[in-house]
């Protein structure tokens, strides 16, 4: 069951006072947060549909809030000291176990004898880190397969830095990590001791080498540890399983699905794209008396011939099994969608957390293949009441039948205030971004000119500064004003976009970000054309 449709998950009402929307403001309602992209732009927690990249901590008890502050003073310092000492202990055990060994030695054969025992001691030290960090209870369900039965552990959902507790509690198994990880102070030695499979990002053959290493370990007669892979590739809020990256499934070997659950009263450790930062999460997690983690091993999944030949099919089928066991839907969202949302946020696009759903709805309406947004953009400043459009006017402007359900969905996605109205500017910014997200910033800025100025040849200072806010966060107000004055050498009070382009071309080393194309983002189906005047 795949979901990408509007689905209420918390009602349309703003939560009552006392609900924590931002971890820094305990006891303060913060369902809606003002962004600085436009006056009429808001970002909400995405309760129109299941958005796996949004998380809010809801603590509605004044007693609980008081407890957090009391334990911050009485318990948190002790826990921090305990975590640090445990980490140092684990590092010391790892250093002893690695004495006289190189990375090549670790890659050549599995650890045996006393080095294997020291590896267990290192894992115990890391387990104490989590114990001091409030995770006193880790429940194991199901039977953990051996490395010969399932060389790969596919873990989901991936929602937090705490998920690494699985590595500590399960052996430890190996992980797939960037080569640079080995150089991290303290943790680098500990990770090395788990005999990870390192990925060389600068090597174009890195993926094939990683697959070969996994297959070699699986077929070896030596006692290699299993390899843990978080198949989602990014953190989610556990409301749905997003698309699995196929890396764990390319080798075509049996895998064991592993579920991570956190049956606690408050979710203070989910770390998503739109949510509390890691330090705030650590603070709230370590000021609980204790937290629970549940690790469930599902039966080994042996791929069919079709699945061995098609890693994506294999990944999707394993995901369905895990979603059914968790009782959650699967989602069309993927790691690449996080890249799109991050780019939208950097470019001050309204509702960046919803931009993927907005794009899908625009495509269903066929607006991605039309030039209606460019036409509306060109005449935008001559329109009235564009910040308060009802559904009828909105449909007429888009030239879409009012009976079209996707029009109503798009309207709901843009109506974060639940006022029954939407902003035309917000829609145009979203629509143009969806079409031009693979283009360079200069092309995108050119498409937005008429949202701020009647003519591309006479852009006043205020309009120029507002336009530059969409330059990926590289040109703040102070820099944009300085750039305007550098262009307006004759003190006319306005500049042309062409003069701006000319200056950036002459100083391309300073403005190379304007010419960079994000080829890794999904390509749009159509390209928008814009008029200059």
UniProtKB/Swiss-Prot annotation:
Transmembrane segments: 80-100
Entry membrane topology: Single-pass type II membrane protein
SMART domains for the chain: PlsC
Biological processes annotated in GO: lipid modification; phospholipid biosynthetic process
Cytoplasmic side: 1-79
SUPFAM superfamilies named in the record: EF-hand, Glycerol-3-phosphate (1)-acyltransferase
Keyword Calcium carried by entry: yes
Compartments where located: Endoplasmic reticulum membrane; Golgi apparatus membrane; Lipid droplet
Principal EC category: transferase
Coiled-coil regions listed in the entry: none
Catalytic activity entry: a 1-acyl-sn-glycero-3-phosphocholine + an acyl-CoA = a 1,2-diacyl-sn-glycero-3-phosphocholine + CoA
Lumenal side: 101-533
Motif (HXXXXD motif): 158-163
Keywords for this protein: Acyltransferase, Calcium, Endoplasmic reticulum, Golgi apparatus, Lipid biosynthesis, Lipid droplet, Lipid metabolism, Membrane, Phospholipid biosynthesis, Phospholipid metabolism, Repeat, Signal-anchor, Transferase, Transmembrane, Transmembrane helix
Domain EF-hand: 402-437, 439-474, 475-510
Biological role: Acetyltransferase which mediates the conversion of 1-acyl-sn-glycero-3-phosphocholine (LPC) into phosphatidylcholine (PC). Has a calcium-independent activity. Displays a clear preference for saturated fatty acyl-CoAs, and 1-myristoyl or 1-palmitoyl LPC as acyl donors and acceptors, respectively. Involved in the regulation of lipid droplet number and size.
Similarity annotation: Belongs to the 1-acyl-sn-glycerol-3-phosphate acyltransferase family.
Protein name: Lysophosphatidylcholine acyltransferase
Source species of the chain: Drosophila melanogaster (Fruit fly)
């Amino acid at each position: 069951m795949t979901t990408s449709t509007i689905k209420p998950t918390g009602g349309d009402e703003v939560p009552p006072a006392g609900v924590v929307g931002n971890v820094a403001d305990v006891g303060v309602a913060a369902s809606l947060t003002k962004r600085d992209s436009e006056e009429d732009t808001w970002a909400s927690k995405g309760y129109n549909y299941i958005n796996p990249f949004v998380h809010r901590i809801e603590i509605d008890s004044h007693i609980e809030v008081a407890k957090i502050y009391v334990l911050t003073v009485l318990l948190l310092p002790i826990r921090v000291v305990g975590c640090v000492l445990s980490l140092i202990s684990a590092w010391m055990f790892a250093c002893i176990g690695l004495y006289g060994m190189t990375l090549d030695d670790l890659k050549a054969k599995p650890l045996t004898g006393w080095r294997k025992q020291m590896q267990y001691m290192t894992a115990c030290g890391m387990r104490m880190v989590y114990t001091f960090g409030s995770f006193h209870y880790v429940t194991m369900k199901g039977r953990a397969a051996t490395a010969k039965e399932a060389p790969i552990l596919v873990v989901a959902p991936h929602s937090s830095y705490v998920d690494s507790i699985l590595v500590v509690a399960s052996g430890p198994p190996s992980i797939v990590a960037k080569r640079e990880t080995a150089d991290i102070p303290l943790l680098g030695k500990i990770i090395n001791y788990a005999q990870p499979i390192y990925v060389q990002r600068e090597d174009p053959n890195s993926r094939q080498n990683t697959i070969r290493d996994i297959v070699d370990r699986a077929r070896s007669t030596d006692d290699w540890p299993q390899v843990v892979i978080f198949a989602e590739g990014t953190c989610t809020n556990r409301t749905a399983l997003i698309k699995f990256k196929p890396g764990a499934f390319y080798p075509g070997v049996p895998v064991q699905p592993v579920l991570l659950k956190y049956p606690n009263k408050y979710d203070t450790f989910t770390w998503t794209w739109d949510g509390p930062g890691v330090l705030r999460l650590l603070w709230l997690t370590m000021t609980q008396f204790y937290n629970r983690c549940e690790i469930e091993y599902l039966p080994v999944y042996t791929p069919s011939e079709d699945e061995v030949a098609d890693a994506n099919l294999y990944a999707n089928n394993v995901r369905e099994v895990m979603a059914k066991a968790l009782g959650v839907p699967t989602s069309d969202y993927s790691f690449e969608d996080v890249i799109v949302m991050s780019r939208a946020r950097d470019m001050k696009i309204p509702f960046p957390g919803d931009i993927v759903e907005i794009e899908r709805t625009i495509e269903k309406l066929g607006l991605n293949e039309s030039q209606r947004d460019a036409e509306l953009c060109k005449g935008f400043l001559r329109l009235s009441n564009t910040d308060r459009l009802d559904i009828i006017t909105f449909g007429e402007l888009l030239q879409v039948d009012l009976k079209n359900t996707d029009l109503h969905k798009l309207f709901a996605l843009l109506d974060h205030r639940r006022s029954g109205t939407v902003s035309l500017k917000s829609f145009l910014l979203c629509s143009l971004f969806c079409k031009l997200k693979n283009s360079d910033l200069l092309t995108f800025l050119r498409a937005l000119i008429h949202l701020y100025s009647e003519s591309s040849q006479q852009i006043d200072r205020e309009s120029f500064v507002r336009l530059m806010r969409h330059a990926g966060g590289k040109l703040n107000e102070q820099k944009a004003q300085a750039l305007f004055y550098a262009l307006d050498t004759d003190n006319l009070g306005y500049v042309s976009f062409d003069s701006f382009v000319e200056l950036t071309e002459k100083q391309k080393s300073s403005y190379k970000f304007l010419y960079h194309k994000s080829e890794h983002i999904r390509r749009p189906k159509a390209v928008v054309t814009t008029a200059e005047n």
